[in-house]
């Protein structure tokens, strides 16, 4: 499976699970539900083997922003119950 197929599969799963539209996840929207969906997307992409620079290109963010999301995912998950639920129940395989 190529990178774009992996990205498409995972972003669609995240969108379905979080009920946040794909275009909103990829936007610069900063409401909590959208940001949680974006963090979940980045973490799942990272877990699937994509490099931060590859993720950055797909989500239209900087590599630094992607690294920040990866580094702070578990901290954000501790403060957000829904993000933890999404992480524990999302099956992206």
Task: Please identify what each model-predicted range represents.
Residues 34-50:
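Short, amphipathic alpha-helical "recognition" segments used to contact nucleic acids or chromatin
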Residues 54-58:
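Short alpha-helical "recognition helix" segments of helix-turn-helix
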Residues 11, 51-53:
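Helix-turn-helix DNA-binding elements, focusing on the entry/boundary residues of the two helices
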Residues 16-38:
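Short, Lys/Arg-enriched anionic-surface-contact patches
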Residues 46, 70, 77:
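DNA major-groove recognition helix of helix-turn-helix
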Residues 76-93:
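Short Lys/Arg-enriched helix C-cap and helix-to-coil transition segments
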Residues 63-67:
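Helix-turn-helix DNA-binding helix
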């Amino acid at each position: 499976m190529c990178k774009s197929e992996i990205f498409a599969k995972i972003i669609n799963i995240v969108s379905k699970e979080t009920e946040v539209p794909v275009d909103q996840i990829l936007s610069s929207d900063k409401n909590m539900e959208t940001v949680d969906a974006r963090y979940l997307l980045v973490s799942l992409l990272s877990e699937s083997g994509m490099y931060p620079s590859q993720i950055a290109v797909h989500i239209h963010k900087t590599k630094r922003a992607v690294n920040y999301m990866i580094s702070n995912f578990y901290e954000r998950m501790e403060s957000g119950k829904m993000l933890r639920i999404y992480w524990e129940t999302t099956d992206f395989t």
